[in-house]
Amino acid sequence: MKTQPLISVCIPVFSTEPYLLQCLRSAYRQDFNAFEIVVVSDASRGKDSNGRTAKKLIKIAQKECNRFRKQNNLSPVQIRFIEHRENRGLIEVRRTLCTQSCGIYITQLDSDDEMEEGALSAMYSVAESTGFDIIHGTSIAGTFDENNNFIPQEQNRYGVIYYGTIEGRNVFRNWIINNDLTANTWGKLIKRELFLKAYENIPYTECNMADDFLLFFFLSQYAKSYIGIQNKVYRYRVNTGMTSHRLIDSLHKWKMICSAASVFTVISSWLENHQKNENKDQNQNDNTVYLLPDEMEKLRAKARYYILNNIQQMRERVVPELLPQAREMLCEYWGEDFVKLVEKVIDSHQEEQ
C-alpha cells in the first residue's frame, strides 16, 4: 500500500519553461522524505533555451531526481505532470493542483522561483509540533545572474511575514486590516483541507490578477491558526513570472487581467449568501461569517486599486488595434460607470501634475 505524502509541492507553469528545471531541482533536492511534486501546465506553449517543453523537462527532472535521491539516501519523490487543454488562469491552475495533490499539507512553488535548502523540513517540523493550519516561512526576493547565482534585494516587499502566532479570526484581520502578512500562497505550508474548503466557495474563475487575494481571502477566513518563522524557505525571482509586464496583444490575455473584477464578484456573492448582523458578538462559536465595517472598506479599497491598475495596463500595454475592444471588455467586467469614474480621476490627477 502506497504511503500518503506529508507534503505536496505544487507548481503552476505558463511560459516559464526557461526556469522550470532549476525550480524542480530546488524541490527534489530537499532533505525531506514523504513528499511529492505536482506540476500543472496551463496550456503553456513555452520552451526552454534548448527547445524543451514542460512535459519533456518533467521527464528529465524525474530521472535526475531518482539519481540524486538514491545517491543521497533519500526516499524517492514522484513528479506528476498535468496539462490543461485550454488556458484557464492561475485561480484554476491552483485549483487543479490542490484537487490532484495527495499531501496532508500543500506548499505552492511558482515555476520561476526556487525553494531554499531545508525549506520543507523547516516548515513541516513546525507544522508537526504545533498542528497549525498555516506555516509561513521567510522569503528572499532578488534576481539571478548569467551563472544562475541568486542576488538578493535589500528589501522584500513581495513576502511580508508576521513572526509569531495568530489564532482565530485574527488571521484574517492581521492580513486584511494590519497588512502584517502578504496574501501570496507561495512560501507557506498550508493544510490541503483548508485549500479545499476555500475552493468550495470559489466558482470557476478565469483570472491572472488578484488570484492570491481571492484565495487567501477564503484561506484566512477558515484558518484557525498561523505562525510565521524565521527560517528562509523561498527565493522569489523578481519581474519574470506569469503576469510580468508583457505586451497585451490578444483579447484572451486582456481578459485574464481585467477579469480581476471577478474576484470581487465572487467575494460579494459569498457575503450576500453568508453575511449576518455585523454587530453580532464575534466570540460566539456558531460559525457565523461576516465582515466588519473596516474590513468592508479594505475590500472596497482593494477593488479600487485593481480597477486603477487595469486601466493603467490597458493604456500602457494593450496594442492600439485592440484598445476599443479592450475598453469594452473592461466595462463589461467592472461596469461602465465605475470605469468612467476612475478614468476621470486618473485624467484629473495627470492634468494636475
Residue positions per predicted region:
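Acidic metal-phosphate-binding loop of nucleotide-sugar-dependent transferases
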Residues: R88, D113-E114
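Glycine-rich, basic loop-to-helix element that forms the pyrophosphate-binding segment
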Residues: E83-S101
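Short aromatic/hydrophobic "clamp" motif used to bind/position activated sugar donors
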Residues: I106
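C-terminal subregions of glycosyltransferases and related glycan-biosynthesis enzymes
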Residues: M209, K232-Q353
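Cell-envelope/extracellular polymer assembly enzymes that use nucleotide-activated donors
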Residues: P5-S8, E36, L214
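Acidic donor-binding segment of Leloir-type glycosyltransferases
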Residues: S26-E83
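Short, well-formed alpha-helical segments that are part of the catalytic scaffolds
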Residues: S15-R29
